[in-house]
């Protein structure tokens, strides 16, 4: 999602009634490093590389590492022995010139940003709203999550049952856990919940742009997402490529064809270091990896006799497998295919409920979006084959390779 900060601020002036919301939206884009169009293009580049949240945390509470202080609204508006309270003008001076409200020089570790006064005012307004945004969906007696999975398959019911089985009831830290539907095509529908579960992977960036955590997307993530915003339990696309490249490097009988060529770049790059070569007229393919099942039949004609490597999604797309080939199925969703015989969607809901229960236990009573996301490495995930300390984004790098014939 692209935010035009100057445009939003101009609208704030023109439309008095919704000005506060628009200013906060502009400030959020700055805070998250997603304001791609600013008065000075250098600001957008600097924020993308060094967003405020990377040092001060998604909740603005600061961090011990680098001694980043809290910058949420209550902290800035409270006078300390070292300085008076910040207002928008003093905050603008701080982020542009590195000078505190009291006039002293701020740490050189803090980047200076070429913000205009309206941009700094928008960021200041967002920081004031940040504590409330961090606690969306949290009341003294209830915590509410959004669920974006298709409504017809009983996903929410299976999710709720799995969570309650792991918790031993419907409550954690004195709160009932509730799930409500959200529209994966409209990130605004997730603003009133703590986090959203079961989004299509392609919808995650829009929710992240709203500052809404995305838990357990329904498909593989690319692999470069921020674990402070997104957590899954399926291997990322980058992780699957790495695992497949390693397996081909050890098991391939000769050159490897990848089909279609338009999707081959990532895997070919992973193979380039020590993997088998691409085929040639002199040395034809002995293995073929098919990434798009709709092109399976055409792909096989280009590599007669080659052993086929194909993932579950490509098998689903193709609707069949050749009877005259060796086939290795690439299982990049091992958590969803198990001995229970569940459908993949039911298995996803069951695992989501179990993981969420343990993360909520670890996050504690003082629950915010940032604390929820930070609790993953500390959660006790016994029996779930996940480790968010070793694999912060996905909890796993496991990919299985299954000979089918």
Describe every region a protein language model picked out.
Residues 50, 66, 118, 140-142, ...:
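Extracytoplasmic
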Residues 1-4:
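Positively charged n-region of N-terminal signal peptides that target proteins for export
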């Amino acid at each position: 999602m692209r935010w035009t900060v100057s445009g939003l601020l101009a609208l704030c002036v023109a439309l008095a009634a919704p000005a506060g919301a628009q200013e906060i939206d502009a400030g959020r884009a700055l805070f998250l490093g997603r304001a791609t169009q600013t008065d000075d293009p250098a600001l957008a580049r600097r924020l993308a590389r060094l967003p405020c949240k990377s040092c001060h945390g998604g909740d603005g509470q600061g961090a011990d590492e680098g001694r980043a202080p809290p910058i949420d609204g209550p902290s800035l508006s409270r006078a300390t022995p070292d300085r008076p309270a910040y207002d928008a003008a003093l905050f603008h001076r701080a982020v542009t010139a590195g000078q505190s409200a009291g006039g002293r020089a701020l740490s050189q570790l803090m980047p200076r940003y070429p913000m205009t006064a309206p941009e700094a005012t928008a960021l200041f307004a967002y920081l004031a709203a940040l504590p409330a945004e961090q606690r969306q969906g949290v009341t003294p007696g209830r915590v509410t999550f959004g669920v974006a999975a298709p409504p017809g398959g009983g996903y929410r019911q299976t999710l709720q049952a799995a969570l309650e089985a792991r918790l031993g009831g419907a409550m954690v830290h004195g709160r009932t856990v509730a799930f409500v539907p959200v529209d994966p095509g409209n990130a605004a529908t997730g603003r009133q919940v703590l986090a959203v579960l079961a989004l299509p992977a392609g919808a995650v960036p829009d929710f992240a742009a709203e500052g809404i955590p995305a838990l357990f997307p329904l498909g593989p993530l690319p692999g470069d997402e921020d674990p402070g915003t997104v957590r899954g339990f399926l291997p990322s696309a980058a992780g699957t490529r790495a695992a497949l490249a390693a397996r081909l490097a050890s098991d391939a009988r000769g050159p490897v064809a990848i089909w279609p060529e338009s999707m081959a770049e990532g895997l070919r790059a992973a193979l380039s270091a020590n993997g088998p070569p691409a085929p040639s007229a002199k040395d034809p393919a002995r293995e073929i990896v098919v990434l798009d099942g709709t092109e399976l039949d055409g792909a096989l004609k280009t590599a007669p006799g080659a052993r086929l490597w194909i993932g579950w999604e490509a098998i689903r797309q193709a609707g069949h497998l050749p009877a005259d080939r060796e086939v290795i199925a690439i299982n990049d969703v091992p958590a969803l295919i198990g001995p229970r015989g569940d459908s993949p969607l039911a298995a996803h809901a069951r695992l989501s409920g179990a993981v969420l229960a343990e993360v909520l236990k670890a996050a504690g009573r003082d629950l915010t979006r940032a604390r929820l996301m930070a609790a993953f490495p500390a959660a006790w995930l016994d029996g779930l084959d996940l480790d968010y300390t070793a694999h912060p984004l996905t909890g796993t790098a496991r990919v299985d390779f299954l000979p089918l014939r």
